[in-house]
Structures are given as C-alpha cells and as structure tokens.
Amino acid sequence: MFPMVTGFMNYGQQTVRAARYIGQSFMITLSHANRLPVTIQYPYEKSITSERFRGRIHFEFDKCIACEVCVRVCPIDLPVVDWRLETDIRKKRLLNYSIDFGICIFCGNCVEYCPTNCLSMTEEYELSTYDRHELNYNQIALGRLPMSVIGDYTVRTIMNSTQIKISMDKPLDSRTITN
C-alpha cells in the first residue's frame, strides 16, 4: 500500500514541478513581448556601428615605411607589400600595398601593431560583390575613406537607445550618439 501512495506523491510532485517550469518559461516569453523590434529594413535603415567596430581597413600610403610588420602579425600573412630599396638614401620605398578582403578575417592585428599608424579600421561593412576579385583592394582603393553612415542623408539611422537629445552645434559622430 505504501509504495502506491509514494508513487502518487512522486507523480504529484513531478506534475507541480513541470507546471512551475512551464510557468517560468511562459513568463520569460511574456517579458520579451514588450521589447522593441530588433529587425531593421536594411537597405533603407542602418544601425550605427560601435566605436570599436572592425570594418574595412583604411591605408595611408604616405605614412607607410614598408616595414612589413603588418604581414608578420597577420595570422594568414595577408597584406601584400611590394617595396624597393633605394640605395642612395638606404631606405625602403613602397611600391604597392594590397589586402584581399575575401580572405581577411578582420582581426585588427595589422592596425594594432603598425608603428606609423598608417592603417586604421573604418565603419564600412558593405563589402559584398558578385566577383571575388573585386575584394582585392590596392593602395588607391584602401586610401578612400567611406562615407559615414551618420552623415549620409539618404539613409535613416536606427538609434538603439530611446530618444537622445543631440545638440546641433557639435558635429555628429558615433561618440555623441552612443553617449
């Protein structure tokens, strides 16, 4: 007789425990119901990238000393640096610099270890093309600065926080919007 009673008690405890778990998960589901939607209409609305976002690499040809530190610290030896040794002044002269963004993993080591700060990360993330050979950027393509998403009047940016008061005296940048 007692084993049957303990079996019913165990069944009752398991039923109560299951109902509690279902109730807890239902409460979590309901708590997400009052949040704002996360989906944005991408080509027309763009989210503002963070300050530390690793986008396309910007290269300044005049600052580069062809030391090849960027190639040595790159985990996949990606940047291609072509240089010639000028014997009269005994310095390297940079001829060509290119990065293939189809292979780049955007780790940022080249930017971090560059001694002359000729490399920097931009907020540009739209690098998609139909031909993978178009992702091989030379020093001319790397030297172009992308148009800022914040300053682009054709795109409506999505601010992740609630209404932010921005004074029009200061220029818009990612720091004034996120603060």
Curated annotation (Swiss-Prot):
Subcellular locations according to the entry: Plastid, Chloroplast thylakoid membrane
Entry keyword Plastid: yes
Cofactor note: Binds 2 [4Fe-4S] clusters per subunit.
PROSITE patterns to which the protein is assigned, alphabetical: 4FE4S_FER_1, 4FE4S_FER_2
Database matches in Pfam families: Fer4_7
Cofactor(s) needed for function: [4Fe-4S] cluster
Name of the protein this chain belongs to: NAD(P)H-quinone oxidoreductase subunit I, chloroplastic
Gene that specifies this protein: ndhI
